[in-house]
Every structure is written in C-alpha cells, then in structure tokens.
Amino acid sequence: MRWCGRNGGFGMPLVALGRSACKVETIVYGKLRMTEEKSLHKDAYTLILDAIDEGLYRPGARMVESELAERFGVSRTPIREALQRLETQRLLIREGRSLIVASLDHNQLAELYAVRAELEGLAARLAAQHAAAEEVRVLRKMVEEDSRLIGDPAALARANRRFHKQIHLASHNRYLVRQLDLVHRTMALLATTSLAVEGRSQTAIGEHEAIVRAIEARDGDAADAALRAHISRAFETRLRLVSAAAEGLA
C-alpha cells in the first residue's frame, strides 16, 4: 500500500485519500513553506534595518552576509534577499564587491526633510479629517506617555517613530502611508537621533502636543502647519548635529 504525505510519511493510505488528496496536501504544504520563507525574508529585512536605525551599522559600514546571518541567527538565504532589497531601496550601496550602508550628503538630507514635511503635513491634515475618535485618543495617550521618556533619547526616538506612524495610519490613505514608510526607512541612515540634542526632547514633546491638539479640534490647516513646523525644527537640529560632527572630524 502506498502512503500519502511529505516524504511518504503523512500516515494516510492512497486507498483512503486518493491521489487528489495527496496533491492538495502537497500544495498546502508548499504554500506553508512559501509563507514561512517570506516571513524569514521579512524578518531578516526588519532586523537589518533596525540595526542600521539603532546605529549598530553606521554609514560606510560593510554588510557581510555571513556575519549578519550569525548575528541574527538567520540562514544566509533570507539575509541575501534582505540585502538585495535594501540595495534596491538605496539604503545600501556597492563599493567594489562589498555592500555598505549608504550615507546622505547635505543636499540629500535637505531633500529628505522637504519631502517629509510635505507628506507628513498632508498626513496630519487628513488625520484631522478622517481619524476615528479612538485613533485620536491613542495619539493623546502617546504624548502623555512619551513626556515621561525625556532624558532617555533612545527610548524617546522609538516612541517618536510610533507617534508619527500612528498619524500616518490615521490619515486613512494607503498610498500616502506607503510613501511615508519609504521616507522613514531612509531616515534610518541618519544613525543618530536629534532628540539627543540638549533641550530638543522637551521641545519635540511640545510640538507633538500642538499636532494632537489640532487633530482633536479637527482643524486640518492647523494640524498641517504644526506638523510642518515640527519637521522644520527637527531639520534645523539635525543640521546642527551634522555641523558639530564635521567640526569634530576637522
């Protein structure tokens, strides 16, 4: 009697199930394997991107496939897929035969913040118009909780990303969310947070408060203006950071 299943060991005879059942089981298993592989690729991508964002791999750092696989406990195939994806997104660039973390020059930095101000301002405007009451309450709670993180720039930076992501989602515009995801992935190349600059944390929380207040009031113009002002001040702080770093290297 022949048996149906992976490697002939599923435990159900062909007499009972028939050949079609074997085919179905094989297809289902194939889909499960594809899902697992896609999950691994996604996880490897996220792990590497988070490591860049947290400064573990700074601009100019070489990304070695075998080292990444060992660090994250992932096989080399999903690591390779993730590196290819990051290269396509220009977060990694080729230097000879090596892949290195990309860096942003002054013009690229200015372009990034200009696009971010436009898109995030629009997201805030749309959130004021379309956000559910529950979403607005979540934003309010975030501001209250984040104020307790002043003094911990790394934790506040993570909270800041969650806050901005919540505004993106509250816009209820999937195409805008997609573009903002790309912008924020590129922000990972900055490696350091402007919230570490003295006084910036308190100021940023106040700016978040103004954004949420405008969204609560359903005032799209005010929400747009508050978000743009927030990005403008963040860019100004970033420029000071870059200038200070350049002086340190001189």
Name every feature range the model reports, one short phrase each:
Residues 232-241:
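Short arginine-rich
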Residues 131-132, 199-200:
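Short coil/turn segments
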Residues 110-117, 216, 224, 228:
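Short amphipathic alpha-helical segments with heptad-repeat character
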Residues 1-129, 240-250:
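Short linear motifs at protein or domain termini
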Residues 133-193, 205-214, 222-232:
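Conserved amphipathic alpha-helical segments that form helical-bundle/coiled-coil interaction surfaces
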